[in-house]
Amino acid sequence: MSTTENRRMKLIRRLAAACLALVPWNTSRHADAAEPLVLAKTGYLFAGGKIDTSLPSSPMIGQLYAEFQIPQKLLHPYPIVMIHGGSQTGTNFTGTPDGREGWAQFFLRRGYAVYVVDQVARGRAGYWTQSYGPVTPPDLDRTLQRFAAPERYDLWPQAHLHTQWPGAAKPGDPVFDAFYATQFPSLTNFAAQQELNRDAGAALLDKIGLAILLTHSQSGAIGWPIADKRPNLVKAIVAVEPSGPPAHDIDFKGAPDWFADVAKTKISGLGDIPLTYDPPLKDGEQLSFVRQDKPDQPDLVRCWSQAAPARQLPNLKNIPILIISSEASYHASYDHCTAAYLTQAGVANTFIHLPDVGIHGNGHMMMLEKDSDAIAGVIGNWLDKALPGKAASHSAQR
């Protein structure tokens, strides 16, 4: 894609994002939160997995955990399946570390059924060393640098803009300690993460039927394969700062160089397990990638794309997709590359950079930050436009 075409597509996306923000949802919770949240049904389920008799005690492995809530006043036919990112669990969506309601409650109050996932080998899904292999533990310095206090480290150009963390963002602060207590070890093997959760996520959709996927960070690389495997069951994808950028991860170095590509190549462009491409790859064949000569602007990375002619992603192209990127996160430097990669592969998508719709100062954990409701409102606006129409009833498990 030429530099001129890149600029034109970026302008179109910004105009579309601005239009979405013109008629915002009522994101104030002062009235809603004062009222009890009335549920028609609540419960949990496990999806996927099998009993492994080759291991001592024959454990169940490969399953995810999902808790669901169905509001009494159900207004939308498709539930939202919320999938957390690396080092996290579903608690990312069920409340904030300073005690406010989370995105799960936000969308429940607006008439959506919600399924909140703990990924395979994480949280209530359970972890077995013999089956899943090594894990990477949460790290205090990385948690502060990437999530709670990037402005103190300046590892990427936008980090100094971070203002929305609800607290002092340091050990001993009750809000930070409440957040840090939620951090979990994650499987070290990214391909295993993605394969296990793709299969369990597909099994969840087989149980509950048509649904909206809301992914964040690491689970972005899970959402694409789930949709690729079950394209007829995914009504929309909301990818909140999805795992990226395409082809190569980034090491953040600070000024003046800022960015360095990680040598390892993502085999599907968007992750470490295969996706369905057209024309299909032959046995042993790999995707070929090329990098921009210059970034779209100085504070952004140079994007990788497919070498021409680009293969298409047929199983994703009929699914409405929203990619959201905040102002101060490390993703602010590269989420536009993910949007461009999908576009090149024939997958239409909406890219919203939050400052373009007047929402400033957020980091990567935006669903926990002070203005989390405003961001949920942007998502709600987009869903209203992408999936018009409402339904009076919806079964919790079909």
Regions inferred by a protein language model and the residue ranges of each:
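N-terminal cap/lid segment of alpha/beta-hydrolase-fold proteins
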Residues: 34-75
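Short beta-strand element of the alpha/beta-hydrolase
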Residues: 76-85
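Short substrate-entry loop that stabilizes the transition state in hydrolases
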Residues: 86-98, 104, 124, 247, ...
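Conserved alpha/beta-hydrolase
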Residues: 100, 104-126
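Conserved acidic catalytic loop of the alpha/beta-hydrolase fold
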Residues: 191-212
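Gly/Ala-rich beta-loop-alpha elbow adjacent to hydrolase catalytic centers
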Residues: 214-223
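Short beta-strand/loop motif that positions the catalytic acidic residue
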Residues: 323-325
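Catalytic active-site module of serine/aspartate enzymes centered on a nucleophile-bearing elbow/loop
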Residues: 361, 365-398
